[in-house]
Amino acid sequence: SVGAGVIYGPSYRGSDDYVFSPIPVVQGNLGGVGISPRAGGIALDFIPDRDGEVSFSAGIAAKLSRNRAAQIKDPVVRSYGELETAIEVGPSAGVSVPALLNPYDSLSFNIDAVWDVAGAHNGMSVNPSITYFTPLSRGIAVSLSVSAKHIDDDFADYYYSVPAGGPLPEFQAEGGFESAGGNLLGVFDLDGDVTNGGLALIALGGYSRMLGDAKRTPFTSIRGDADQWMGAVG
């Protein structure tokens, strides 16, 4: 399945200003390779699954990070300049357990570990997540996800350190947990059958909380907000 939508979210990680951005959505199976969406990218699963059984996934995740690379609405943060776009690639693995509360639901555990290969932040992040999926009817399905993000020192320094000599206090950021939060996704199939891959409408809402130095940086604590909200339709 291929789709497109629009997301309304913070203008940068930790911002209290919100902007609209287009988003592509790709999910399905191509030549035996599973394709799952990720924030800003996709994950490929090279292990075939069997219906009705516990399944394992292993493959590659690839993400595009445009944090503070565009659409910075805050004039003080913008005065520190736009950052480079990061391309993050690394291994992805998970396990999915079906038929917990009904014959069609599932509980999935996934983890991605990705490194910047474009020379932007030159760091890495680890992203664990848990997702519960269930249909509400033949044409409507929902999923609830909780996730966290752990970053290394290079990642933290690039996005959250504040150099001396500017309008904000100097700050040296170090790695740790960057954020944790949850998303609720709803899918409404236009022909009443979510299993046949036809046209569908999606709605997504989410909340995350900035943690550690991502919360303490003046970009968040003075010019932004640790509480981050987002919504998307497509």
Cite the ranges covered by each PLM segment.
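Glycine- and aromatic-enriched membrane insertion/assembly motifs of diderm outer-membrane
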Residues: 18-71, 84-112
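A contiguous pocket-lining binding segment that forms or flanks enzyme active sites
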Residues: 122-169
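Residues that define the transmembrane beta-barrel architecture of outer-membrane proteins
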Residues: 18-24, 52-54, 83-89, 122-126, ...
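Short loop/turn motifs that connect adjacent beta-strands in outer-membrane beta-barrel proteins
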Residues: 1, 14, 33-56, 98-106, ...
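Predominantly the C-terminal beta-signal and adjacent terminal strand-loop region
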Residues: 187-234
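Structural signature of outer-membrane beta-barrel domains
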Residues: 9-11, 63-67, 98, 114-118, ...
